[in-house]
Design a protein with these regions (language model features):
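Membrane-embedded alpha-helical segments of integral membrane proteins
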Residues: 1-29
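Amphipathic, cytosolic membrane-interfacial segments at TM-TM junctions
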Residues: 24-45
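Internal/C-terminal transmembrane anchor helices
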Residues: 39-64
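Ser/Thr/Pro/Gly-rich low-complexity linker/stalk segments immediately outside membranes or between
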Residues: 63-77
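Metalloprotease/metallohydrolase-associated module, dominated by Zn2+-dependent proteases
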Residues: 73-90, 95-97, 108-115, 120, ...
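A short beta-strand-loop micro-motif that forms or neighbors metal/cofactor-
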Residues: 152-169
Length: 231
């Protein structure tokens, strides 16, 4: 069933007593009895007070699973990552064209610019990443998702390469380089998923793995997070 339809049904069921109380209040109010209308307003107030925290909690947990939280991991932890680290919640479990062999990973490029110092790192977010079945033993699916992490690291290193080649510290220019790297990384990630069909096209998956590994090796000297300017 469509997840939006499910949400609509849940709200209708939750608020059905509210609608019934409103009907009774309007009916009584027309007869000159205003007490039911006052009771309805009070009932509505408490209903809203309950549902708003529930919605907020629902939204927070959908974004990040704080009930089973694991802090973001830097790229040096790459080899340790397995589907056990995918702790994100999906209240309405998704699938890929009906196939339960499905997962997604959340990564980011984080930066900090201080006086004459720039720190840039790629992060994998366990509590925002999701796998349909944690006990899946699909090595192909895990490899596909982990290469998303490598791609983020690749564009992090590309940004560090460009920043390292600046003649002097320039905060505005550095921010532009990082923003462009983030945009290029997002575009590359989308193309990767499209070309590999989320790991199902094995030949494309292997092509991307070879390309990404090769580029990462070429940028090995930029794996350290911190860049310092001495001018």
């Amino acid at each position: 069933m469509n997840e939006y339809l499910i949400i609509t049904l849940i709200f209708l069921v939750y608020f059905s007593p509210v609608f019934y109380q409103l009907y009774l209040a309007i009916k009584e109010n027309k007869g000159g009895n205003t007490i039911p209308l006052k009771k309805f307003k009070k009932f509505l107030k408490y209903s809203v007070m309950i549902i708003i925290p529930v919605i907020i909690g629902f939204g927070l947990l959908s974004h990040t699973n704080y009930l089973n939280y694991e802090k973001p991991l830097t790229f040096d932890k790459y080899e340790q990552i397995s589907f056990e680290n995918f702790r994100g919640l999906e209240f309405f479990k998704k699938s890929l064209y009906g196939n339960e062999r499905f997962a997604y990973v959340v990564t980011s490029i984080e930066s900090e610019i201080d006086d004459k110092t720039v720190t840039i790192q790629s992060f994998f977010h366990p509590s925002r990443s999701f796998v349909y079945k944690k006990n899946t033993n699909s090595k192909e699916l895990l490899a596909h998702e982990k290469y998303h992490i490598k791609i983020t690291e690749l564009f992090t290193r590309k940004a560090k390469e460009k920043i390292s080649k600046l003649n002097k510290f320039n905060g505005k220019k550095i921010e532009e380089i990082i923003r462009q790297a983030e945009q290029d990384e997002r575009n590359f990630q989308r193309q990767y998923d499209y070309d590999t069909f989320h790991s199902y096209v094995l030949s494309e998956q292997k092509r991307y793995e070879k390309e990404v590994d090769s580029l990462l090796n070429l940028l090995t000297e930029y794996k350290e997070p911190k860049i310092e300017f001495n001018d």
